[in-house]
Every structure is written in structure tokens, then in C-alpha cells.
């Protein structure tokens, strides 16, 4: 564990994790209000909610270029400010084109932040990369929960509709940017001189890490997207709320557990393989039953996704040389979020082509196989 004297650094890492998701999850919490106000179609809603994930893939490598040119901390601050401004500007949208543009700006900011965090964790928590990653991943998960849980009572308290809600959830990101600028540890090199930024796409480990991480993100996003309509199709609409809550809150126990043990297990194959096996079994239970076991399986799938997510986020900083962490992280994010865009499309096509609702979960099951197949091939005894 980090020492008590490093608590402010730990707090900053946690807050940065919160900032990664706070503004993104503010949109689903008010999207119904936006739909009614701007008269959005279902396709337009799909595009505006999918834009951030697409930006995570498209802008990850350019984010590594910014890190190489400005340094890790400066690039991170740029990402925070762009995220806060873009998110707040969404509130001024009077039409779908403006909403697309401001959402793209916000997604670009987050896409810059994501590859900056692994090298920052390596700088700020030397020797405890697993713990540092678990800290900011826990913040990320909290950042996913807060807008969903508190937007409705917040809007009832302050009034102002969806526009006020988007502004309110942008303000903490701006505050976090100020705290990082004032309180971030100094005296460490932000980036090596003449730092390389373009990933080495011929490097096998990049593809292994990217596809393994892609399996995790795809399982999570695709299950969130298809579980409600699947339950509705089998006549269990009554379980939608409890199953989604179990899926998303199931990540939190894994994150808390890894705060204690991440440093000890991040370099071992078995956690990834075990989580893959349990995730695969959970998907099987989801499609094979129609009772309360669905909620339990959703919770276990969320636990596995949260656990592998935390460990996989640490791997670039654990396995790569310091000068390669940012560009490797960018490549991993580009590959993983590219998968997260494609797999839901494949799941939807499988359902449409077969007419069988369960078929949408076959690509999700294939994603669960990726940790099983790829983790044993990764050299976990790489650079410390």
C-alpha cells in the first residue's frame, strides 16, 4: 500500500477516475428529457450515446501524440478542461447537430485523459501500479454510478431540466482540473525526451492486451445494451431494473477487493483465466434461465468485468518501459473500444438474422473467451 503521506496523491487518482465517466453517464440520465425537447429519433439517440465510445477508439492514439508533445500532466489537464467545457456546452444544444458536436468535444477530452492515466499511475505510485490503477478504476466506477443515481433528485432540487443537469455534472470535472493543477506531485519527469507516440502495431503484446481488454469492454457495453430488450422479449420486463443494477453494481466489490490485492496478482495468469471462466458461465446462465438466477448471473458478470478491467488497465504500466506506457495504452484503448463499437452491432445482427433473442449473447460469450485464450500468452514477467 502507499504511505499515509501519499494520501493526497491517492485522492487525486481517485478523482481522476471519477472524471473519466461522470459527464458521459450524465447523458443517459437525462436522454429521455432531451429526446422530448429536441424531438430525437431512436437512431439519433443511439448515435449521441455511442459517440463517446467511438471517440475513445479514434482519438486514443492522437492523445498519445499530445502526451508526447506536452507531457503527461499537461495533456491530462487539457483533457479535463476539454471534457468539462464540451460537457457544459451540450446544455446549449438547440438541435441534434449541436448536440453531436458538443458530445464529440467532450468525448475527445476523455479520450485524451484515458491514455494519460497509466503513465501517470506509474509516476505517482512507483512500485504500486496495481494499487494505483485499482484506485482510479474505483473512481471510474463511482463516476458511472453517481449521475445515474442522483440526477433525478438533483433536478428536482435545482430545477432547470436537462440543461441544468448537464452543467451541474460538468462542474466537478472543472474542480478536479483545478485540484490536479494545484496539488499534483511535482519533480518527476512528465515524459521522456523525444518520446515516441505512434504504437508499434507489429508488437504482439499490444494486440494481446488490446483484444483482451476489448473482450472486457465489449462484454460490459453489449450486455448493458441487450439485457433489457432480451428480458422484455422473454416476458421478464419486471427483472430489467434489478438485472441492470446487479450488472453495474457488481463491478464495485471487485474494485474494492483489488485495492487490497491488485499488486500481488496483476502479474499472474490465473485471475484473468478464472474471471473469463466465470464470465462465460454467467452468460450461459443469463440465456438458459428466466428466473432470479438472471440477477445473480448479472452480478457475477459485472464482478468479472470490473475485476479484469482493473487488472488490464494496469498492464501497460506494469509490462512496458516508461517511455512506451502512453503509446501502448493508447493502442490498447483504440483496439478495445473499437471492439466495444463492433460487438454490439454483431450481436444485433445475430438477433435480426436468426430471429432468436438468445443469439445476441453468442458474441458476448466469445468475448468472455478472450481472457482465457490470450492471458496465457502474455509475458507477465516483463519490465517492472
What are these regions (language model features)?
Residues 68-80, 263-276:
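Cytoplasmic membrane-interface "Motif A"-like loop-to-helix N-cap segments
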Amino acid at each position: 500500500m502507499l504511505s499515509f503521506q501519499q494520501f493526497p496523491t491517492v485522492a487525486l487518482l481517485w478523482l481522476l477516475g471519477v472524471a473519466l465517466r461522470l459527464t458521459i453517464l450524465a447523458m443517459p440520465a437525462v436522454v429521455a428529457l432531451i429526446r422530448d425537447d429536441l424531438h430525437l429519433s431512436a437512431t439519433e439517440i443511439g448515435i449521441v450515446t455511442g459517440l463517446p465510445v467511438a471517440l475513445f477508439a479514434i482519438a486514443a492514439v492522437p492523445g498519445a501524440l499530445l502526451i508526447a508533445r506536452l507531457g503527461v500532466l499537461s495533456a491530462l489537464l487539457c483533457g479535463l478542461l476539454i471534457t468539462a467545457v464540451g460537457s457544459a456546452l451540450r446544455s446549449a444544444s438547440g438541435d441534434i447537430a449541436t448536440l453531436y458536436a458538443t458530445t464529440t468535444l467532450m468525448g475527445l477530452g476523455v479520450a485524451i485523459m484515458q491514455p494519460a492515466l497509466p503513465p501517470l499511475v506509474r509516476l505517482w505510485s512507483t512500485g504500486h501500479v496495481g494499487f494505483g490503477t485499482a484506485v482510479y478504476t474505483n473512481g471510474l466506477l463511482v463516476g458511472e454510478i453517481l449521475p445515474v443515481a442522483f440526477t433525478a433528485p438533483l433536478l428536482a432540487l435545482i430545477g432547470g431540466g436537462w440543461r441544468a443537469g448537464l452543467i451541474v455534472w460538468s462542474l466537478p470535472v472543472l474542480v478536479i482540473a483545478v485540484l490536479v493543477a494545484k496539488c499534483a506531485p511535482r519533480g518527476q519527469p512528465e515524459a521522456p525526451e523525444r518520446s515516441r507516440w505512434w504504437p508499434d502495431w507489429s508488437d504482439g503484446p499490444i494486440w494481446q492486451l488490446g483484444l483482451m481488454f476489448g473482450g472486457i469492454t465489449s462484454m460490459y457495453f453489449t450486455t448493458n445494451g441487450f439485457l433489457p430488450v432480451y428480458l422484455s422479449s422473454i416476458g421478464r420486463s419486471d427483472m430489467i431494473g434489478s438485472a441492470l443494477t446487479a450488472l453495474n453494481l457488481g463491478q464495485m466489490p471487485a474494485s474494492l477487493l483489488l485495492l487490497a490485492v491488485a499488486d500481488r496478482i496483476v502479474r499472474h495468469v490465473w485471475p484473468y483465466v478464472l474471471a473469463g471462466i466465470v464470465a462465460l458461465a454467467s452468460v450461459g446462465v443469463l440465456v438458459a434461465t428466466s428466473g432470479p438466477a438472471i440477477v445473480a448471473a448479472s452480478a457475477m458478470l459485472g464482478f468479472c468485468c470490473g475485476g479484469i478491467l482493473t487488472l488490464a488497465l494496469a498492464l501497460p504500466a506494469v509490462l512496458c518501459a516508461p517511455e512506451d506506457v502512453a503509446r501502448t495504452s493508447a493502442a490498447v484503448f483504440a483496439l478495445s473500444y473499437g471492439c466495444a463499437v463492433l460487438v454490439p452491432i454483431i450481436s444485433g445482427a445475430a438477433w435480426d438474422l436468426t430471429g432468436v433473442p438468445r443469439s445476441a449473447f453468442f458474441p458476448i460469450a466469445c468475448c468472455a473467451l478472450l481472457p482465457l485464450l490470450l492471458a496465457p500468452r502474455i509475458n507477465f514477467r516483463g519490465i517492472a
